[in-house]
């Protein structure tokens, strides 16, 4: 999401802004995501861990930071089940480091904060738990009920940001988004995983009965929403950003397969590989939430944002991007990714 946000911001504001991109470059980080902007004079990349207070404080000391958009997080639920420690460290302690660094840089002697400063914490709808009935939606007032180590770590980080807003009047907002998809998404996530496997004739793993429902948000729509909250959102408020594109996981797979068949040219050998026969049902994920769905009423009413990309259109754009960036996919699915994939799905 961070890569797409940076691309969006430069496309919209060009030379009116300067962006400092801080990334630890874990397994899912890839500098190639931003290679077309790396030579811009108003773009700086800093390799750093958000848990490293000295490194983060140094960035604030050496630069006049007006806004922070805090994307950095461990975000894959399956990984959190196998290794929750990493999620607590990055998502909770890392957020604390970011809050403390921004507070130290922005706070005035009288306890107020410099004009125009804002911290935006990017979070997830998974903190709200699971919905059972159609017609029910997550609102900003929905009580938190996380069910996985990932969602618990994000809920904890949200609470930290809320505590800083309440205790110090720290200038911040929180956004909770639904499932993102689009260019540059690491193929541990459902949509790029299915696209990549289908094109290679590999099995398409589906948890449980495949009827878990997610609300899908095209990543550029999300980037626009974050920018609009930064520009127009009321301080200390939470905004839900959702796509109004609810689909069962098995529906997603069928849509991807149909779209691949439609978009692959005649004579392309991959066309014969793409088949529903690849669908493989595997043991359900532990604590698997049944349904997520966001009500984006507040962000629409207060800042004028709404999702512009229908799911079928977004999938076509996503597949087109993967067709045009096959080398990127080859690079990110080599080495460590193969071991991860085997650990996640081989024995299920």
What residues fall within each predicted segment?
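Residue-level recognition of oxygen-bearing side chains
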Residues: 55, 86, 93, 186-190, ...
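C-terminal substrate-binding subdomain of Rossmann-fold SDR/epimerase-dehydratase oxidoreductases
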Residues: 4-8, 12, 48-51, 174, ...
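N-terminal Rossmann-like NAD(P)+-binding domain of SDR-like oxidoreductases, especially those catalyzing
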Residues: 1-180, 230, 259, 290, ...
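Short, conserved catalytic or interaction motifs in soluble domains
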Residues: 27, 183, 243
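A glycine/serine/threonine-rich, flexible loop-to-helix segment
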Residues: 37, 134, 187-195
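Residues at alpha-helix caps and immediate loop-helix transition turns in enzyme cores, especially N-
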Residues: 30-33, 83, 186-190, 252, ...
């Amino acid at each position: 999401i961070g890569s797409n946000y940076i691309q969006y911001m430069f496309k919209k504001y060009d030379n009116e802004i300067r962006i400092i991109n801080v990334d630890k470059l874990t397994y899912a980080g890839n500098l190639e995501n931003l290679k077309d902007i790396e030579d811009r004079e108003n773009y700086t990349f800093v390799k750093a861990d958000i848990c490293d207070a000295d490194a983060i404080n140094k960035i604030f000391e050496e630069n006049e930071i007006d806004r922070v958009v805090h994307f950095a997080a461990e975000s894959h639920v399956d990984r959190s089940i196998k290794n929750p420690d990493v999620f607590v460290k990055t998502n909770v302690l890392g957020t604390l480091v970011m809050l403390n660094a921004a507070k130290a840089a922005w706070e005035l002697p009288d306890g107020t904060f410099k004009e125009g400063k804002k911290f935006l914490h990017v979070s997830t709808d998974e903190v709200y738990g699971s919905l059972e009935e159609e017609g029910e939606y997550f609102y900003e007032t929905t009580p938190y009920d996380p069910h996985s180590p990932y969602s618990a770590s994000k809920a904890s980080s949200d609470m930290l940001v809320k505590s800083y807003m309440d205790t110090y009047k720290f200038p911040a907002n929180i956004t909770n988004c639904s499932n993102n998809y689009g260019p540059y998404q690491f193929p541990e996530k459902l949509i790029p995983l299915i696209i990549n496997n289908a094109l290679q004739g590999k099995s398409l793993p589906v948890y449980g009965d495949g009827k878990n429902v997610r609300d899908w948000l095209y990543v550029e729509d999300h980037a626009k929403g974050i920018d609009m909250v930064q520009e127009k959102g009321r301080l200390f408020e939470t905004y839900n950003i959702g796509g109004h594109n609810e689909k069962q996981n098995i529906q997603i797979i069928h849509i991807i397969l149909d779209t691949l068949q439609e978009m692959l040219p005649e004579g392309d050998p991959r066309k014969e590989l793409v088949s529903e026969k690849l669908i493989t049902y595997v043991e359900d994920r532990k604590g698997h939430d049944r349904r997520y769905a966001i009500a984006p009423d507040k962000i629409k009413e207060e800042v004028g944002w709404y999702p512009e990309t229908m799911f079928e259109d977004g999938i076509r754009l996503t597949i087109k991007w993967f067709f045009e960036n096959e080398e990127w996919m080859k690079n990110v699915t080599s080495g460590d990714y193969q071991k991860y994939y085997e650990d996640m799905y081989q024995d299920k």
